[in-house]
């Protein structure tokens, strides 16, 4: 008992120091968006859309600066100097990403990326069936095997969550429980009623908070581990599972297309964005994989297919950014789209239902092959994908490292499972694009030459602004490294 109390006290002290340090860093010299007259004037001249989210709507999340990121093991069969350079920079890249990641979609992407690099058997890419529901592996792992960084970020992302009505807030002070965590995911089986709400403030987006679904589900399962209970504290496993069920209710009650039930990216009105192809479909298919649920695998495949039908410009085989008000071909949107499709494919192929969805798999593989061809045909003279493709305005067409990195990451993942559907030309172009992204990463681990992710003054690349930092670009570079590591080329 004394040992446990000391252990908890030690972690509480560390957590307090972390919060104080983080707050000082944020209110001190950290200024990752250079707001200046030049940017404002440029945006006005380009007639760009409004920013993705206003600053006052930012999620109530403070980065935990105590997190430590190890050097990952590289693939020694890859002799590329740029690959070796990126390997050495990864801890700095992750540290920087952690320092500026605060919004719902950023947190979802960051936690997924950390899992891919450090705990890949918890992802569809190297799935271990013992992590599936009923396998019980999360409860048995020892200290060094637990994905502490992901669990801490996932827990802290729920700092503003309203736990009223949760299993642990019952009137008699005890947790209303079920033997199965999955019961809390569905209102029909939950011991306590759901209260429909998002996991985190989505800044008006219905889809973005859904990107956290895998991380919160993993947090729920690991919260049964006695070491996690001692070291992390937080809510009960049942509470986290219940919150996830609330998120699913909130998602499924949002605006949908009347013809095929494709879910909207936005809360207030029906809008389809390429971004959502990473947020919604693969989160649903991941639950399908983890729960061994054919229904959720089907949801994920159907949502990605519906979004593809609405957004793919088949004249060039490139995704439009938004189905109506921004039909331009945006690099990062295409990265979101193809990587979401890749995660979907890996989930269904790792599940027991691959043979059930043969037709959908074949269709998705064919679509991805054509989109990779279309995107790599657009590489500029630096071998980056232009921020907006097919534009006469050169400011809009500046090469974007963020979108390029995510497309390259998706391509290497695709190469691993569909080697017969690619060719040497595409693989060589992917390597050149890989090298082009790495060339733009500075010695401190900042990915430069990336689009302003918030669209503060328009989704534009400011290549000469060293203070324009992107949480997405940081995560995408790490995804690109891991994907190539596994492809082995």
Q: Predicted regions span which residues?
A:
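Fungal secretory targeting signals
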Residues: 1-29
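Short, charged N-terminal helix-start/capping segments
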Residues: 5, 75-94, 200-206, 267-275, ...
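CBM-like carbohydrate-recognition segments
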Residues: 39-109, 113-215, 219-239, 254, ...
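Extended ligand-binding clefts on enzyme/binding-domain cores
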Residues: 271-408, 420-452, 468, 472, ...
